[in-house]
Swiss-Prot record:
GO terms for molecular function: metal ion binding; peptidase activity. This is Probable carboxypeptidase S-like 2. Its EC number is 3.4.17.-. It is found in: Membrane. Zn(2+) 2 binds at residues 151, 184, 246.
Length: 519
């Protein structure tokens, strides 16, 4: 042994023992244990504090709800059914539109006949020949007006032989109103006008002015209708608006959200952007008997596969608000998770990724929609083209997506040949405003068993043209649907229940009246 060390020990300094090592180890264990206990207590405390964000409202009795209208449910349904018989189909090509132009004009006349008080007491402006803007002047011009929006055009109908009832027949049975436009969006337009007609019959006069804007080409992007409606407001110095409510998300019956047994009324406080990117590959072709090692189709297929397998990273910014509202109403295990997103968010995001409908709420989606190459079985084409539609989540920009495409493909043979239909994600409306409280409270009055929650609108609406008119834009329609009904939108057998259509009328009626109370 080193003499110096031996001397130290001889002078009374003790050697390290296993006991001291054990003491240090036990101290570390105590620290870790206390830390874990502290984290657990914080998780539990967060769960306890995670209470409902649904306001307490006066639930309307059935007698009170029904007292405002003299029309029966079936009479209301018949008027909507008649509205669906007009083939107000939106087409981009002028020669195609010409054959449907009379249908729009006939629909205008139908509205004048069906809602005489609306057309007597409200000022109507026809915009771009077919879009409609009504002005219901308020008693106090110092108050900001509100805008209720919708659209009167519908998408074309395909596979007519698969429809239970012809899409423009105006068919009604004991339960449903069948036809193109019942859900998107003549149901909302007619319900709004029914509610106004009833309010006028009672002599109701709003404190603030109310505008109603119904575009004629929403299904094509609103570039003629809503775009010119915005110009009309700007030219006439109308606005800013207190809020805008347009078509949007429905009330979905469970199961929709994990751990939640109630229906969800989702209010779109923003909406995704969009961009179409066309990819092209040009490589020498030739006869199929002498193929080269690479082909335009093969190279492009690999590029598209890379994009599908490497989507943009998730962005849970606005989706956190959905979790914040809905998570508070979930059963305990899920409430524990959603009240502690700081810890469990990566796990929740991974779960969302397994379901396309939920994954669309957290990331920019990638959809290959067009692929063109070749026209003969024994000829290798020298060119292949593909168009990918991206729906851009708030937090990403369209430029981010262009960079993403180039980075993921990383192949000089693949060129971006065209970029089109660029829409940036919409601004986000506040959930703490009086306007949101008005909307949430009115929904709960009419549908007391639902959970109202803000979310991202994954499709685009006419509101893309209205961003400059207000900070408060909401996208919601009180249709009550099951998940299986969503395919009827733009699909086969579009329909709405007679009972639910009456609820639409009730909802807009009380929304207008509640502006006096909540704003």
């Amino acid at each position: 042994m080193d003499k110096r060390k031996q001397s130290d020990y001889d002078n009374g300094k003790s050697k390290p023992t296993n006991g001291s090592k054990t003491t240090k180890f036990n101290l570390i264990k105590i620290i870790i244990r206390n830390l874990l206990i502290g984290i657990l207590l914080m998780l539990v405390l967060n769960t306890i504090r995670f209470t409902s964000k649904q306001p307490k409202v006066e639930i309307l009795s059935p007698d009170h709800i029904d007292s405002f209208t003299t029309l029966s449910d079936i009479e209301l349904a018949q008027r909507l059914a008649k509205a669906t018989t007009f083939k107000t189909i939106s087409f981009g090509e002028s020669d195609e539109f010409d054959q449907y132009e009379p249908e729009f004009l006939k629909f205008h006349e139908f509205l004048k006949i069906t809602f005489p008080k609306v057309h007597k007491y409200l000022k109507l402006n026809i915009i771009a020949n077919y879009s409609l803007v009504y002005n219901w002047k308020g008693l106090d011009e110092s108050l900001k007006p509100i805008l209720l929006a919708g659209h009167i055009d519908v998408v074309p109908t395909l596979f007519l032989d698969k429809w239970t009832h012809p899409p423009f027949s105006g068919h009604i049975d004991d339960t449903y109103i069948w036809g193109r436009g019942t859900m998107d969006d003549k149901g909302s337009v007619m319900a709004i006008l029914e509610s106004v007609e009833d309010l006028l019959s009672q002599g109701f006069k709003p404190q603030r002015s109310i505008y109603f804007a119904f575009g004629h080409d929403e299904e094509l992007g609103g570039n003629n209708g809503a775009f010119n409606i915005n110009k009309y407001f700007d030219t006439n110095e109308i606005g800013p608006f207190e809020f805008i409510l347009d078509e949007g998300l429905p009330i979905l019956l469970p199961p929709v959200f994990p751990g939640l047994s109630k229906p969800i009324a989702s209010v779109g406080i923003t909406e995704k952007g969009a961009i179409d990117i066309k990819l092209s590959v040009t490589i020498v072709g030739g006869h199929s008997s002498m193929p080269r090692r690479e082909s335009a189709i093969g190279v492009l297929a690999q590029a598209v596969s890379k994009l599908e397998n490497n989507p943009p990273s998730p962005k849970l910014r606005e989706t956190r608000l959905l979790f914040d509202f809905v998570g508070r109403e979930c059963s305990l295990p899920y409430r524990f998770l959603f009240s502690n997103l700081w810890l469990f968010e990566p796990i929740i995001s991974r779960v969302l990724s397994t379901k396309p409908t939920l994954d669309a709420l957290q990331r920019t989606t990638t959809a290959l929609t067009i692929f063109n190459a070749g026209n003969k079985a024994n000829v290798i084409p020298m060119e292949a083209n593909a168009t990918i539609n991206f729906r851009v989540v708030p937090g990403d920009s369209t430029n981010d997506i262009i960079d993403h495409v180039n980075r993921v493909i990383n192949d000089d043979r693949v060129k971006i040949s065209k970029i089109s239909n660029i829409i940036e994600p919409a601004p986000v409306s506040s959930t703490t405003s009086k306007s949101f409280n008005l909307l949430q409270s009115t929904i709960l009055q009419e549908f007391p068993d639902v959970v109202v929650a803000p979310t991202i609108m994954i499709a685009n609406t006419d509101t893309r043209h209205y961003w400059n008119l207000t900070e408060n834009i909401f996208r919601f329609c009180p249709m009550v649907l099951e998940n299986s009904d969503l395919q009827r939108l733009h699909g086969i057998d579009e329909r709405l229940t007679i009972k639910n259509y009456k609820q639409l009328v009730d909802f807009y009626y009380h929304l207008i009246k509640n502006t006096e109370k909540y704003l």
